[in-house]
Amino acid sequence: MTSALIWMASPPEVHSALLSSGPGPGPVLAAATGWSSLGREYAAVAEELGALLAAVQAGVWQGPSAESFAAACLPYLSWLTQASADCAAAAARLEAVTAAYAAALVAMPTLAELAANHATHGAMVATNFFGINTIPIAVNEADYVRMWLQAATTMATYQAVADSAVRSIPDSVPPPRILKSNAQSQHSSSNNSGGADPVDDFIAEILKIITGGRVIWDPEAGTVNGLPYDAYTNPGTLMWWIARSLELLQDFQEFAKLLFTNPVKAFQFLVDLILFDWPTHMLQLATWLAENPQLLVAALTPAISGLGAVSGLAGLTGLVPQPPVVPAPAPDAVVPTVLPLAGTATPTTAPASAPAAGAAPGPPAGTATATSASVPTSAGGFPPYLVGSGPGIDFDAGTPAGSRRAQPAADNVTAVAAAQVSARHQARRRRRAAAKERGNADEFVDMDSGPAIPPSGERDAWASNSGVGGLGFAGTASNETVAAPAGLTTLADDEFQCGPRMPMLPGAWDLGTWDRGD
């Protein structure tokens, strides 16, 4: 009932397409022919063996030996006869499956019939003016429902017949060993030590059920599918692993029984396994792996990966110390290209006004200028020129004579500054040579190239007249009628950003009188 509902869930087009496009009855008929041929072979062998046994018992071999031979071969003769009948039954079942397929193919609506039904339905729906095709459309739809039910019923019937035929095929039974009756009893007693083990019988039944009768284990005879364990020599087959597992199971059972009854014999049995049985199977496995190296690589890959993971833990024992970071040398202070003038430094000795009469004469102008210029400060009071853009081309013409006399001191200041810059450059080179060279070398940008030293004969700094006081001979009084300059005043630029080009001077200041020191 369940299978019928399953087949009913699909439209008839699906069933018809699957049944028509399959491999057909050819493979099933070939299998039936093979089973029939095998059954005839078994029957022929059984007939030949029966004739041989009859001849042995009635001929010159008549006697106890002939009877023993006939008794040993009778189980095998019975197996041949039964195998012949089983093969014939399997062939008949497969032929029944073929017949069921043919019947289903005939009863199944064809794809052409289904396509014609759909075409007719579409045409009638398209020409159904005023409902004149209502009854023909209903008849057409009823016919499609009939084909739907017919297809589902056909597939359900075919499934039932095929399943019953396949399930009724008898299982193949392994052939019995041709052994003498007393030899059979001795072999059974040696393998089972006085009877079959219920655990072995249970395992044999489980194997038979799981494999669908393809693995028949006989614990009493020590065979798998009628063959002894050692008959399976190819590790590439599943039967080799099954035979080895069952053999090891019986070996350990035998060792456990002997260990409690006869420890000496148990030790001998274990030595026999270690020296003769296990090396044989290990050699078979090694030979097979040598012939199939790709399987060996696939088997060893997980183990190698595990070793790699374990070796990676070695990094946890201690971290590699990082090399010390060498600090980058601090950049040198930027030296201005133009040194501050003496007027921008804070004076320390000379007063702003002229000394009184009778006072000690002041130091020479050159000495005072050099003293005040040797102590430069980082922040001057005011720029040396606050009018326009500085002195013009004729600046030398308007310079006082006292300032001209201060030129040697300015040259000395320039030489001292150049020496200081050279010393800083040498210190920087020594630091670079002592620094450790790393993979990523550091490059330092040298932004200060030292003060520009003017060529000989040119002056770029002038001494200031402020704070020098009156000059003249010792013991003479200076003329106080002329006021000393107090500073510079900058006028605001006009709308065109053009200011005065000459400094403002007091109206009563006689430049010639000031230069003469009167």
Swiss-Prot record:
Instruction: Please tell me whether the keyword Secreted is annotated for this protein.
Output: yes
Residue numbers spanned by region Disordered:
177-197, 346-375, 435-458
* Primary location group: secreted
| Function, as annotated | May play an important role in the persistence of mycobacteria in host cells. May regulate the innate immune response of macrophages by promoting the production of pro-inflammatory cytokines and inhibiting the production of anti-inflammatory cytokines. Promotes the death of macrophages during infection.
Q: What else is known?
A: Expression in M.smegmatis enhances the ability to resist in vitro stress and early survival in macrophages. Macrophages infected with recombinant M.smegmatis produce significantly greater amounts of interleukin (IL)-1beta, IL-6, tumor necrosis factor (TNF)-alpha and an early decrease in IL-10 along with higher levels of host cell death.
**Localization in the cell:** Secreted, Cell wall
Query: Which keywords label this protein?
Result: Cell wall, Secreted, Virulence
Q: Name one GO cellular component term.
A: cytosol
Biological process terms from the Gene Ontology for this record are: response to host immune response
What gene is this protein translated from? PPE11
Q: Please give the SUPFAM superfamilies that the UniProt record associates with this protein.
A: PE/PPE dimer-like
Task: State the Pfam families in the record.
Answer: PPE, PPE-PPW
Task: Fetch the InterPro entries from UniProt.
Answer: PPE-PPW_C, PPE_dom, PPE_sf
Protein name (record): PPE family protein PPE11
> Composition bias, kind Low complexity: at what positions?
181-196
